[in-house]
A protein has these predicted regions:
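Acidic-and-aromatic substrate-binding clefts and catalytic sites of carbohydrate-active enzymes
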Residues: 5-10, 40-43, 76, 123-128
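Short low-complexity, flexible loop/linker segments enriched in glycine and/or proline
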Residues: 3-16, 82-83, 133-134, 158-160
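Substrate-binding clefts and catalytic carboxylate motifs of secreted carbohydrate-active enzymes
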Residues: 28-32, 49-74, 88-284
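Short gly/ser/thr-rich secondary-structure transition/capping motifs
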Residues: 13, 76-81, 98
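N-terminal catalytic cores of secreted or lumenal carbohydrate-active enzymes
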Residues: 1-27, 52, 60, 91
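Active-site groove signature of glycoside hydrolases
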Residues: 16-45, 85, 89-95
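Active-site cleft segment of glycoside hydrolase catalytic domains centered on the general acid/base Glu
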Residues: 3-6, 35-62, 83
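Short acidic, glycine/serine/threonine-rich loops at helix termini
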Residues: 43-44, 79-80, 154-158
């Protein structure tokens, strides 16, 4: 009953004006967004009218920043297709935010060569695909992952479960799950494995390693869309002595060697697709 859409027509201009006037002198502001995953984004004429009105409100108080929107594919508007209808989303805006559709960057650039694109939401598991395109193309200016830090709600959105044949993989999880678990950083402020992986992508560190927890017999790991495999940046697996564990080595180096207590386990290529080499190692 209190959803903001009930007050949007009356309050959106006033609230947006207040936000821009409050924050326009902060150097951290690089763009103003008029929304994220907006249902009416390509509707005619409603989407066009709303977009023009909000952009006009922003430019009334700040002409120095770009305007943008975060847009998902048309899973919620089945009568539309991205190739045919997405131009209406961005025609009043300076920069186009793409949610989870990095695979459209290059083809959309061919269709709209003046469009400036960034990833406004992306999956942790697809970090390499997104960042490779950022570095490859000047028209792709960056990538925002969903999310930087964990948050309360959407409980278990980023789960990784061990499931048997025919077992259901839910979108969300019940108690004791209470946060989304998709953050690169947890609620205590500690880095999670995907954050160390992203450090490698960003060239902040040359290499990082993580050990995958054992998968029970007759089970397989199912990682939800926003999830990350159940691995830890830890070498302490007391009680698993002699058991073989998977070790992921993340590096931009073309090849890596893994040693266990001074003994060479093997040498593998990492690959430019995901910069990962996986070794099977007996725990000592």
């Amino acid at each position: 009953e209190q959803d903001y859409h009930q007050f949007f027509d009356e309050w959106s201009d006033r609230d947006l004006s207040a936000s821009v006037r409050r924050d326009r002198n902060h150097p951290s502001i690089i763009m103003w967004s008029i929304g994220n995953e907006v249902a009416q984004r390509a509707d005619e004429p409603e989407g066009d009218l709303i977009s023009k009105r909000l952009v006009g409100t922003i430019r009334k108080y700040d002409t120095s920043r770009f305007t943008t929107i975060g847009s998902n594919d048309f899973w919620d508007r089945r009568q539309f297709t991205w190739d045919k209808d997405s131009y209406r989303i961005f025609r009043n805006l300076d920069v186009a935010g793409y949610n989870y559709i990095w695979w459209k960057y290059e083809s959309d650039h061919a269709a709209y060569p003046d469009r400036v694109i960034y990833g406004s939401e992306s999956y942790p598991k697809e970090a390499a695909q997104n960042w490779n395109l950022v570095e490859k193309h000047p028209y792709v200016i960056g990538d925002f992952v969903w999310t930087a830090i964990d948050y309360l709600g959407e409980a278990g959105l980023a789960h990784a479960l061990y499931l048997g044949e025919g077992e259901h993989n839910p979108q969300f999880m019940g108690w004791p799950w209470y946060n989304g678990w998709c953050g690169d950083i947890d609620l205590c402020g500690d880095k999670k494995p995907q954050s160390y992986y992203r450090d490698v992508l960003w060239r902040e560190r040359p290499l990082t390693m993580a050990v995958h927890a054992p998968v029970p017999d007759n089970k397989k790991e199912v990682v939800n869309g926003w999830g990350w495999p159940n691995e830890l940046v830890s070498w302490n697996w007391k009680g698993l002595e002699g058991q073989t564990l998977s070790v992921n080595v993340y590096s931009r180096s073309p090849k890596v060697r893994l040693y266990l207590n001074g003994k060479l386990i093997g040498e593998k290529e990492t690959g430019k697709e995901n910069y990962t080499a996986t070794f099977e190692v007996p725990y000592e």
